Amino acid sequence: MNNLRETYIKDVKRIVVKVGTSTLTYPTGLLNLNKIENLVRQLSDAQNRGIEVILVSSGAIGAGIGKLGLKERPKTIPEKQAAAAVGQGILLHMYEKIFSEYGKPVGQILLTREDLSHRTRFLNASNTFYSLLEQGVIPIVNENDAIVVDEIKFGDNDTLSAMVASLVDADLLILVTDIDGLYDSNPKTNPDAKFIPVVDEITEDIVAAAGGAGSSLGTGGMATKINAGKIATSSGSSMVIVNGDNRNFLTDILDGKEIGTLFLGQEDHVKAKKHWMAFATKPTGSIIVDDGAEKALVNHNKSLLPKGIISIDGTFQEGEVVSILNSKKEEIAHGITNYNSMEIDLIKGLDSNIIEDKLGYKNYDEVIHKNNLVILENL
């Protein structure tokens, strides 16, 4: 393992792997069962290493094309959506069946861009991912092709996977495609194209080198992967573009081997993200916690539970940034709250298992999840 790959890959704890239509299907549109089985084996093995795994899978439309007996990718939006509606069920059933052979539970998450742009829905999506990962579930993500017009007309799962990587604070995003990585020109048309093993910054030259190559069944070319790289690396995730024809691509990446093109995540992303939560957004209210909760938050990286809350100050809604004060009214943290001020006032000091009895419902055990919390003294 060389020093650069060791630095950026050796300690990854959470990865997002995106596979495209060209990797999952044959040119006929039918599913490539051999590649799917190999993919599942590697993802399962990665989880066995202790790495949390999220799969962003294209292929719903491609699978639907095969099932419906279509000769080529549909051109109209209703035809594409019909193929996606049929294909999504086929794809998930296939994944569930093969993952079960390795004893791995899976959960389907269908997202739209709106889910990741609306504050409350963004928070809900984030909490769903964290809950699944904590229970050892492998989330399988796709954009909801059956209903989202914009995705089918303009979008791609490369961008979606980068947004998911940012959403869950992934250490590494892996885009699996049908070429070895990034070249200085399109290798499909230029036999003298030179391979680029590492990209430390996405410059105009890198964008120009991406070109626009894409397959007949998919929507994402290299240009969309570079755009995904901008999103991922700016939020701190490193990214690798790799050829899915290599049967051990994921194992090789995690072992630090020279495979694919590595895009280096920006090292100051954590600080930047924490500064956003700590300083860029003014808290709309405060939560005062007891000494036990303060210790759990500051020293043990725990979530804030209602039992440790003494009182609240101000009026705020679910999904807003609030200030957390200790019993001496000293500010110790900022966080994104799962409950509004009225709800917290009702459940403060109570065990989480009593939330439903008090409110009539329980959306979360935590008032603020540890992943949505920044300890100010750590900045």
Swiss-Prot record:
A GO BP annotation: L-proline biosynthetic process
The protein's Enzyme Commission number: 2.7.2.11
Pathway the protein takes part in: Amino-acid biosynthesis; L-proline biosynthesis; L-glutamate 5-semialdehyde from L-glutamate: step 1/2
Annotated compartments: Cytoplasm
Binding residue positions for substrate: S58, D145, N157
Family annotation (PROSITE patterns): GLUTAMATE_5_KINASE (PS00902), PUA (PS50890)
Record: residues binding ATP: K18, T177, D178, T219, G220, G221, M222, A223, T224, K225
Keywords for the protein's UniProt record, in alphabetical order: Amino-acid biosynthesis, ATP-binding, Cytoplasm, Kinase, Nucleotide-binding, Proline biosynthesis, Transferase
Superkingdom, natural source: Bacteria
Pfam families (UniProt xref): AA_kinase (PF00696), PUA (PF01472)
Catalytic activity entry: L-glutamate + ATP = L-glutamyl 5-phosphate + ADP
Residue stretches making up the PUA domain: 284-362
Cellular component terms per the entry's GO annotation: cytosol
Gene3D superfamilies the record matches: Acetylglutamate kinase-like, PUA domain
Disulfide bond annotation, renumbered to this chain: none
Recorded GO MF terms: ATP binding; glutamate 5-kinase activity; RNA binding
InterPro entries, per database record: AceGlu_kinase-like_sf (IPR036393), Asp/Glu/Uridylate_kinase (IPR001048), G5K_ProB (IPR041739), Glu/AcGlu_kinase (IPR001057), Glu_5kinase (IPR011529), Glu_5kinase/COase_Synthase (IPR005715), Glutamate_5-kinase_CS (IPR019797), PUA (IPR002478)
Predominant subcellular localization, coarse grouping: cytoplasm
Assigned protein family: Belongs to the glutamate 5-kinase family.
Role, per record: Catalyzes the transfer of a phosphate group to glutamate to form L-glutamate 5-phosphate.
Stated name of the protein: Glutamate 5-kinase
Annotated gene: proB
